[in-house]
Amino acid sequence: MTVPVNRREFLERAALSSAALALIHPTIAAAAVPQQPPGMFLSLAPWATARGVGWPDQARLAAKVGFKGIDWAWGPVREAGVDATRALLAELRIHPTIVNMPGPNVLTVDDAAFKASLKQLDEDTAFAAAIGCTRFQRTLGATTPGGRPKDEHWKIVTGRLAAVSDIMVKHKVHVSLEFLGPMVFRMARAGGPGRRGGEPPVPNAPPPPPPAPPVPFVWSLAETLRLCEASGPNIGITLDAWHWHHSEGTVADILSTPRERIVHVHVSDARAMPPADVQDNMRLLPGEGVMDLVGFFQALRTIGWTGGVACETIGARLDNIAPEEQARLGLASTTAVMQRDGVL
């Protein structure tokens, strides 16, 4: 069982890790680390608002347009290496805000695969820290795998996150869990009838078994917070306004969340429509829909939160628009909303 650490122990262990990294990699320690900008700052999410642009052009586009950070992609940056990446980010003055956790999904793989992944996770975390990034992101499934009982899955997830926390705390890195709010994610079923892979139906075959009913897991801010608190001091939340809105989240939910548990923020907007009709690819640019983004950002300001804010407008709204224009639209719309709300 993992022994929880208090804030002082957490900071002491993180400091020792940084000192050890400096001894092992003096060239890394000597180079300038791209520091996190003060307050709330805009970070480019290329998969949403610079589609089709690869690394390192993503970072160059972020700097050209006016972003201060980038939600970066693991594979090409890892291939480029520490020195080249640090030099590029320092040249562009772009902060490496957050990255999706590489490797298998540690929350759903079997026990053997999970245990086998921990050594590589330690190395990957050290790499992220070496380029100045202190945030890994992982999406939470809104239902349990295979219809597993919720209590059983909760125990597995918190136990694994505690093990991940122990590894990442050495490198002063946080895990950011993103819950999925729209109803469609809670209706997902483990398997179902129908053909797969384009295979023709088998004549006279018996009907397939009925799909396992979905078992909802964690899909709201309040419950994600409880999961984080049960898992480790450096386990936090990606607060996505889209998922907050479609989980019927409230401003009070944000005000009840300790600022240190919010690791990253995504923002977009939504049409007014029945919850059962909402699909994840229907997102609008911030300010174009019905979300209470005033309450959202003012609540973040009230709790004293600072960090990266990424426009994540997924779907047709930005189709057929050039990547640079996507980035400019994302930056301009998010900036306008944040300035209107008095947080930027």
Q: Model-found features: residue ranges?
A:
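Mobile beta-alpha loop/short-helix "lid" or hinge segments that flank ligand
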Residues: 133-143, 183, 272
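Acidic-and-aromatic substrate-binding clefts and catalytic sites of carbohydrate-active enzymes
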Residues: 49-54, 72-83, 105-109, 144-148, ...
